[in-house]
A protein has these predicted regions:
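Juxta-kinase regulatory segment immediately upstream of eukaryotic protein kinase catalytic domains
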Residues: 1-37
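Flexible, glycine- and charge-enriched loops at secondary-structure boundaries
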Residues: 72-79, 134, 138-141, 197, ...
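Conserved alphaE helix
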Residues: 139-151
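Hydrophobic residue at the +6 position relative to the catalytic HRD Asp in the kinase catalytic loop
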Residues: 165-172
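C-lobe/activation-segment region of protein kinase-like
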Residues: 179-252
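Activation-loop N-terminal segment of eukaryotic-like protein kinases
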Residues: 172-178
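Conserved ATP-binding subdomain of kinase catalytic cores across diverse folds
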Residues: 23-123, 153, 157-158, 162, ...
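AlphaC helix of the protein kinase catalytic domain
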Residues: 122-135
Length: 262
């Protein structure tokens, strides 16, 4: 079904539907919800809405401080970076939101329409969908962690570094007995070859930001072993340092656990 929507929206900027999207963008930017749209919780610097029937997302990038405006002149606006970074991921065979239409608003902000990506966040999968202790659920959880490790390893092996690789920014859906993953919120992504170890560490810390009560060391090591197999240029010592340090630093940053890492 999603492929049908992607095909439909590929040339939408040249169709009459584009005018409807621009009209919606103006309405949504003024906090008016057109029929079929629902507001989605987002950061203080964005406004997000979802149209389930049309499988579309709208994201408005609100204007920020003069310093951010200056940065946008040098690096490109957040909307532009989100669009280009998603396209770069898709070109490399890594799933991300497909862009539909983008533009500027009279207020000075920018907006971006994308096709809905199927799936639930890794947070949902680990904290809700795979918490039972029966054999079937345990196998599913192990499969999820192993295939997630392979996916993130492939992302890093191709030089991509996510701006905020939190479990909420990775969606997963199970299709034909395999998990398919997608990266969301790609505004701050970068690409470096070779990939600096400190940036790999930052991504791994972000991904480790789940309580050890919910995701134990065995789970984390299952992910890490699969991740490591995709980055053969890392020596065993480098890989061990990344595994240990990402876990320790994430543990220190978790609320109520400062100083508890051992």
């Amino acid at each position: 079904m999603r492929q049908q929507y992607i095909a439909r929206y590929t040339a939408i900027s040249k169709s009459s539907d584009a005018e409807k999207l621009r009209e919606w963008a103006l309405q949504l930017s003024e906090d008016y919800l057109p029929d079929g749209w629902v507001r989605v919780k987002s950061s203080a610097f964005t406004r997000v809405a979802h149209n389930p029937r049309r499988q579309l997302y709208y994201k408005q990038y609100l204007t920020r401080s003069p310093a951010f405006k200056l940065k946008a002149q040098v690096r490109g606006s957040r909307a532009t970076r989100a669009r280009l970074n998603a396209e770069a991921l898709l070109l490399a065979g890594i799933d991300a939101p497909h862009n539909v239409l983008w533009g500027k608003l009279p207020s000075g902000g920018e907006y971006l329409f994308t096709v809905e990506v199927p799936g639930d966040s890794i947070t949902h999968w680990l904290l809700e969908a795979t918490t039972a202790h029966d054999a079937t659920t345990l196998r599913l959880r192990r499969q999820l962690l192993s295939e997630l490790g392979t996916f993130i390893g492939r992302v890093h092996a191709t030089g991509f570094l996510h701006g905020d690789l939190s479990p909420d920014n990775i969606l997963a859906v199970r299709l034909q007995d395999q998990f398919r993953f997608a990266l969301m919120n790609n505004e701050r992504n970068s690409r470096r070859v070779p990939t600096p170890g400190r940036l790999l560490l930052r991504n791994l810390i972000q991904l480790n930001m789940l309580s050890p009560d919910d995701v134990g060391r065995t789970d984390r090591m299952r992910f890490f072993r699969a991740w490591r197999r995709q980055l053969r240029e890392l020596s065993p010592v480098e890989a061990k340092i990344l595994a240990v340090e990402s876990y320790r630093r994430a543990l220190r940053r978790l609320p109520g656990r400062a100083g508890s890492a051992h």
